Regions:
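Active-site-adjacent loops and short helices of periplasmic peptidoglycan-processing enzymes
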Residues: 1-89, 98-99
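Domain-terminus/edge residues, biased toward the C-terminal soluble/receptor-binding domains
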Residues: 68-72, 80-196
């Protein structure tokens, strides 16, 4: 995938990709899932304004087809933009489908990722999901994020005895989001064990 000047200007870039360089889709997806690389999300969306707009339209259409009808996406990375919105329920629906993609699930639990730049440099990217540091029992993914309007957000997944759980936390704080998520996952695990 070719990086354009449009991608290079995506704030905050995270990777500082240079216009004119090329990367594999898988490497960009990995950077996006591991360290929230917004510039990687922009490149994956196709960058040029026509294809970028087409990507956003397809993204909204797909979300609605999955049942996430209370969302309107205006960019591929989720940064605040007037008119862009979603709900915890829609986030859970989308996460459910992402969770069942083996590549996304694998990449979302990588604690770190060696990322090779087009010029040969390598940088170690660290996962923004702090649940990975002390993995609650049966925790197995997915993604954290932050925006000014949305606060600290997290979608966390777990699986116990064949039962999958997805929790979505929106508008939390960096101090609370991971502790609260861990408490919710522990509570869910306890309830599952009680009902067996």
């Amino acid at each position: 995938m070719l990086v354009t000047i449009w991608d290079q200007l995506t704030p905050p870039t995270k990777l500082d990709l240079e216009a004119g360089t090329r990367y594999r889709k898988r490497d960009l997806l990995a950077a996006m899932l591991v360290c929230s690389a917004n510039d990687a999300a922009s490149v994956l969306a196709g960058s040029g304004r026509a294809s970028y707009g087409d990507f956003i339209a397809r993204m909204n259409k797909r979300a609605k087809r999955l049942g996430a009808g209370n969302s309107c996406f205006l960019n591929p990375h989720g940064l605040d933009l007037p008119g862009q919105y979603s709900t915890a329920r829609d986030s859970a629906i989308i996460a459910y489908h992402a969770y069942h993609d083996p590549l996304i699930r694998h990449l979302s639990v990588m604690e770190s990722l060696p990322f090779q730049y087009a010029d040969g440099r390598t940088s170690i990217l660290h996962n923004t999901n702090m649940l990975l540091l002390h993995r609650p029992p049966y925790f197995n993914g997915l993604k954290s994020g932050f925006t000014i309007l949305g606060g600290k957000c997290l979608v966390a997944t777990s699986k116990y005895d064949g039962v999958e759980t997805i929790i979505v936390m929106l508008d939390s704080t960096p101090q609370d989001v991971f502790q609260d998520a861990e408490k919710l996952l522990q509570w869910r695990l306890k309830r599952l064990k009680e009902n067996m």
